[in-house]
Amino acid sequence: MSHSDKMGASRLLPCQGGGSDQHLRLLNDRDSIYVPHLREGKGSFRVFTEGDDLYDAMIAAINGARKDIRLESFIFAADEVGGRFAKALADRARAGVDVRFHFDSRGSLTNPSTRLYQELMNAGVQLKWYHPWSWRHPSRYFQRDHRKILVIDEQEVFLGGFNIRIENSRVLYGEGRQRDTHVGVQGELARRAAMLFDRLWNYTEDPHVNAIPEDTSEVEALLVPNSSRRCQQRLACLHAGLISESQSYVYLTTPFFCPDTMIGTAMQAAARRGIDVRLLVPRNSDPPFAGWATRAAYEPLLKDGVRIFEYLPRKLHAKTSVIDGWTIIGSANLDHLSLFVNHELVLIAKDPGLREELRNAYMRDLEDAAEVSLPLWMKRGWYERFVEGIGRAGRRVL
């Protein structure tokens, strides 16, 4: 059986960059994933949109670990939430469980706690800071580990957009907590998540460690990273491919939106074909510069029929896509840093239950959002246009 036969109906794309026609070329190369052929899933996913529910589930999983724990987070704060995780990790390490914790040195820079880190190490937890500042290699500091992963005994994995901090807790932070999304699943995906964790932990690019199996026809979900020597645009290609193949709707949620040519072109083309293309972004971005860059992309999208909504009540941090029967959940924003620079990880699935749960959550979010009107947008003042220009010029640092 040929490789293309094994891949079934998979359609694959060379991730070579920005040309508007490049995402239409199909090659037999699974490292450049376009539209994989997955079987329909059976509802084995748990979706979390409240930090308290997620943290309780993660800590319960940590407490039940028997062999090993792998935790990776962009932000680990020395607050009540971080303290709960630290205690659980330390307890399991003292019980003989192999506990490894990899967190980003810049993401956690604003909430440092030497005492907390020392307590973890004293308990036997292995810690690593990803890309701390180095005068010898300053350029490395601009590539971050933005992934959020917890793997328990290579049997269960949690991943998504939630960091470990109090701002995600309704109980501790109140109604102003962040709006985010995470997913939990057991089985083969946990083993593959462990492989990806190990690859970054060991700073290796092992060719034998591949998150995408040879044959995807019997797989209901994939973990797709954007770190590959052969393809530096895997996530952009994935989104552009699914949007280009859409037949009914495209519902995107992202806190930072600075699309590359492939994604922007695919969204506009889909809207012109009559597809219901919607984009949900925050009204108030943090930092404000990110909002300027996001709004710089509005006009061409609106003119082609893309509907844009701005989320109002609180900070939006979720990164999800619901495209016909497909769902994507993970750590990646639709911006330059997430698509092309940082380490990210997303789950892509073809599961009716997961799709409906995320689609319903999207519709609920739209009830708390304001739609951007093209006629009113075209009347915006000189100051808005000026700061959009600044955002457009600096979009590659987002």
Regions found by a protein language model. Give the residues of each.
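Charged, low-complexity intrinsically disordered terminal segments
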Residues: 2-398
